[in-house]
């Protein structure tokens, strides 16, 4: 993202660009997120069109349309940069808007929104959940009964592969990518912990207390310039239902998840057993 000369070298002679890179998390100034997620995407779009790229597939996020309300069996809502939470979501929303606006008869664009991608070797979601479970710091919010969608990594990769060869009618739109198997937060966290040989979370705290703690942690860790152990966004994600309708994705990409959550959890357990 920070090396425009290299990115142009990579683009020359290719027909399809799949743009996955982004600045994630909450640490950093808004400008840092904007530069990495918005400006870099705009430059990549410009270079792609200049070098004759035919298709541009952007890895977006469901958070670009999540304004705090529960999302229950919904399709794709439009990106809402003015109303979403945090610099990451806001800048990803702006970038998605730019990508779809760049669509033309000679330059097909698409945004895929994979939700909570996980699998063996994951250093983001899985590693953090397991570390907290092993240290006894993994907890539930309001019992952990909200339903959420997640995406096994193989299914996410296959969705992007299908997008590369998708019919032209599939482009000029955003599409959701998940396993299509909503489970409670309690079950999801518990099975991840169990796969790693750790105890499932049993402690639960009320939403309002967790949210206050999240805001306090954000303020304290902002001074340290490091990732806080809890954020208001994470609290919201753990306490709010968010699962989606995959009808359009399956139809336009001719794709469906090939690895079930149960198989994914089994594969995760096997990976930890060998680690």
Where is each model-derived feature located?
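Amphipathic terminal alpha-helices
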Residues: 244-252, 256-275
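A conserved pocket-lining segment of Rossmann-fold NAD(P)-dependent short-chain dehydrogenase/reductase
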Residues: 79-82, 109, 131-151, 155, ...
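Conserved Rossmann-fold NAD(P)-dependent oxidoreductase catalytic core, especially the SDR/UDP-sugar
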Residues: 43-87
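Conserved C-terminal active-site "lid" loop/helix of NAD(P)H-dependent oxidoreductases
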Residues: 153, 190, 213-256
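NAD(P)H-binding glycine-rich loop region in Rossmannoid oxidoreductase-like domains
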Residues: 1-39, 43, 47, 67
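Glycine/proline-rich active-site loop of Rossmann-fold NAD(P)-dependent oxidoreductases
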Residues: 93, 106, 118-128, 154, ...
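Active-site Tyr-X1-5-Lys
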Residues: 83-113
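Mid/C-terminal beta-alpha module of Rossmann-like enzyme folds, strongest
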Residues: 166-229, 262-269
């Amino acid at each position: 993202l920070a090396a425009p000369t290299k990115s142009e070298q990579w683009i020359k002679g290719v027909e399809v660009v799949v743009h996955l890179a982004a600045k994630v998390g909450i640490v950093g100034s808004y400008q840092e997120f904007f530069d990495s997620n918005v400006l870099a995407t705009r430059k990549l779009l410009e270079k792609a069109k200049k070098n004759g790229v035919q298709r541009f597939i952007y890895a977006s996020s469901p958070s670009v349309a999540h304004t705090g309300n529960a999302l229950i069996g919904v399709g794709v809502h439009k990106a809402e940069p003015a109303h979403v939470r945090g610099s990451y979501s806001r800048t990803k929303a702006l970038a998605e808007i730019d990508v779809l606006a760049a669509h033309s008869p000679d330059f097909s664009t698409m945004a895929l929104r994979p939700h909570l991608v996980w699998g063996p070797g994951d250093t983001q979601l899985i590693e953090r959940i397991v570390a907290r479970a092993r240290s006894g710091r993994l907890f539930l919010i309001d019992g952990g009964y909200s339903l959420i969608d997640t995406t096994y990594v193989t299914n996410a990769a296959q969705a992007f592969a299908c997008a590369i060869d998708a019919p032209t009618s599939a482009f000029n739109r955003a599409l959701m990518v998940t396993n299509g198997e909503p489970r409670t937060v309690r079950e999801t966290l518990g099975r991840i912990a169990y796969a790693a040989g750790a105890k499932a979370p049993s402690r639960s705290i009320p939403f309002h207390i967790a949210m206050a703690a999240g805001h306090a942690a954000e303020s304290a860790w902002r001074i340290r310039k490091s990732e806080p152990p809890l954020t208001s966004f994470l609290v919201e994600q753990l306490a709010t239902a968010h699962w989606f309708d995959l009808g359009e994705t399956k139809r336009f990409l001719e794709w469906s998840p090939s690895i079930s959550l149960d198989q994914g959890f089994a594969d995760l357990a096997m990976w930890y057993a060998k680690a």
